[in-house]
């Protein structure tokens, strides 16, 4: 893999995960963006949280599928992969998700936190398993359902690779229908993750030149953003109970965002800002796992201040959360690098990327980064 692709993948990860932070900003029903109380600001909330940044989940899963099989099916060692992913995905998921459940339970035992998070005190042991580890439903650390579904994709990866290699069109069309049609989720909590992961496998196994559309990056990016704007307008005027056709269009747009976000990465990676963001990967995982507890904490504090201008909270809380997570990541990296390695699945950061070869040279990913 050349250094440009490697940097763009890291850039996409940090941008998409930062965008996902906006998706998870909490609000009360009286401050729903679909009420239009704040006019254009509410539409912007819908655009960011319900349209544009919904591309994050399928895009991130596509990256995972692509990297997992980028050396081909013949060199794929399933048992070695499971062992690696147990350390790089499963263990961090269990720690981040389980520890937040314990914190929430302890807080609610003191009579705090009710209404902000699921009721852990009166839940059954079966419900606890989902709250802590997303066994049947989303966990209390909401975004981490992605890691749970990603592990399922990894467990199914030999079967998915076999189907995608032998019957690519039928397989991808079937998974696309599963993702966008109102079908039961089955064992997955988010259906688009399976399609994104399989699309990434397809790109690897069939040798797709993922840079072939780079010369059209600007019009592709503009077209995707225009579609996201149109979808946001429809959501704003019909939400929160969207008509079925619009909900399907939203799901399809989020999947199309795989191509759109890749085009955007081509435009950004050559800028100084994009080059800097493309140097590391551990930070994005840290932000992904840690942002939701911070947002809930900020929301609890906000509701005690008596302030009523919700846009102030919406447009400041994500940036404060990201700033805290960047600072804490740097602090833990300096003071407890072994702990950081466990919490981020042994992902390397800027130090490794600082020595990456120049553009056009080959840049590999460690099993941890894949």
Curated annotation (Swiss-Prot):
Cellular localization per UniProt: Cell membrane
GO biological process terms held by the UniProt record: enterobacterial common antigen biosynthetic process
Pathway as given in its UniProt record: Glycan metabolism; exopolysaccharide biosynthesis
Coiled coil: none
Main location: membrane
Pfam family, one: Acyl_transf_3
Keywords: Cell membrane, Exopolysaccharide synthesis, Membrane, Plasmid, Transmembrane, Transmembrane helix
Role this protein plays: Required for the succinyl modification of the seventh sugar (glucose) of the octasaccharide subunit of succinoglycan (EPS I).
Protein name: Succinoglycan biosynthesis protein ExoH
Lineage: Bacteria, Pseudomonadati, Pseudomonadota, Alphaproteobacteria, Hyphomicrobiales
Originating gene: exoH
């Amino acid at each position: 893999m050349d250094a440009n692709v490697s940097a763009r993948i890291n850039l996409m990860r940090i941008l998409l995960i930062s965008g996902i932070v906006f998706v998870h900003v909490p609000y009360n029903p009286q401050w729903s963006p679909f009420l239009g109380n704040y006019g254009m600001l509410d539409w912007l909330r819908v655009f960011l949280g319900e349209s544009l940044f919904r591309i994050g989940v399928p895009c991130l899963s596509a990256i995972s599928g692509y990297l997992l099989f980028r050396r081909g099916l013949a060199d794929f060692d399933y048992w070695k992969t499971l062992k690696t992913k147990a350390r790089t995905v499963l263990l961090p998921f269990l720690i981040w998700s389980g520890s937040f459940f314990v914190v929430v339970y302890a807080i609610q035992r003191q009579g705090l936190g009710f209404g902000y998070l699921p009721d852990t005190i009166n839940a059954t042991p079966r419900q606890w398993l989902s709250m802590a580890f997303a066994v049947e439903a989303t966990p209390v650390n909401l975004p981490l359902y992605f890691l749970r579904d990603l592990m399922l994709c990894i467990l199914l990866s030999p079967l998915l690779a076999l189907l995608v290699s032998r019957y690519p069109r039928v397989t991808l069309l079937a998974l696309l229908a599963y993702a966008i049609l109102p079908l039961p989720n089955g064992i997955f909590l988010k259906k688009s993750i399976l399609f994104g992961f399989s699309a990434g496998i397809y790109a690897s196994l069939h040798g797709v030149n993922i840079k072939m559309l780079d010369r059209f990056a600007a019009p592709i990016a503009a077209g995707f953003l225009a579609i996201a704007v149109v979808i946001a307008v429809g959501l704003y005027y019909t939400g929160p109970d969207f008509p079925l056709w619009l909900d399907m269009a939203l799901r399809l747009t989020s999947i199309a965002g795989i191509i759109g976000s890749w085009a955007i990465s081509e435009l950004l990676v050559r800028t100084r800002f994009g080059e800097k963001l493309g140097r590391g990967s551990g930070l994005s995982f840290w932000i992904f796992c840690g942002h939701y507890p911070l947002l809930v904490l900020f929301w609890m504090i906000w509701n005690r201040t008596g302030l009523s201008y919700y846009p102030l909270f919406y447009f400041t809380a994500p940036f404060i959360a990201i700033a805290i997570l960047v600072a804490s990541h740097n602090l833990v990296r300096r003071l407890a690098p072994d702990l950081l390695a466990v919490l981020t699945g042994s992902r390397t950061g800027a130090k490794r990327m600082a020595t990456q070869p120049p553009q056009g040279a080959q840049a590999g990913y460690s099993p941890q980064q894949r």
